[in-house]
Amino acid sequence: MQFLDARRLTGPSLLFDTHGTVMDIACSADEADRLVSAWKKHVERMLSALGWNDIEFATAKLAGGVSLAFTAPLDALYAASAINEWAWAACDHQLNGADAPDFSAALAEMRDAIAEEANPALVDLEARAAANGVTMLWDDDEASLGLGRHSQTWPVRELPDPQSLEWSQFRDVPTALVTGTNGKTTTVRLAAHILRAADRTVGMSSTDYIAINNEVVDRDDWSGPGGARNVLRHKAVDAAILETARGGLLRRGLGVCT
């Protein structure tokens, strides 16, 4: 068995429709069967000590390994990934005879990490947005409500009081996600051109750049969730075409789901 990585899932993915953490382990099919059971037991032990409830688990057995995931609060995803790494160390001890990790020390570290990452205002805003049927996008730096020209963005540590907001002003714009094996960028450009011909102000993200109509905002590979957020927070955009690469889908989940 070989630990590959543990990371946040910041949006809907193949495993969940919400945020969480996933860990990839290279192993045989037989090893995966033993690992899944041990991993869940260790994660449940840590989550119980932390007082985390209503957590969902998911696994995906793949050729050459297994993905191990569980849901986590929006403002504790780095800590959740650290829990996954600790669970791997505990499994490595149980199944492979590696040194045993110290549970008490790890628990103290997790509590400190959760306290440092905590952002109850962000969690509350997410709940209020869901209750009002409003799309919320977030990352380490910013959170936004609505999409495109109907959106507003704030620093993630300077969020508004949800009760002060006029929720009806936050609405979506037509948004298309383009994924697949070949031809994504070409399809995005073609669709954006069609929308521009219909007098739309089009935001597009691709492996080449982010653009608003014919103005290139930044040249880079923007086919992941970050590109989607950049386009959908632009106040001029009234339609969006987003290239959605499989790498971003697998590593972080969707950048937007409305």
Task: Please give the residue ranges for each predicted region.
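Preference for protein termini
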Residues: 1-175, 197-202, 207, 239
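Phosphate-binding loop of NTP-binding sites
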Residues: 143-149, 162-258
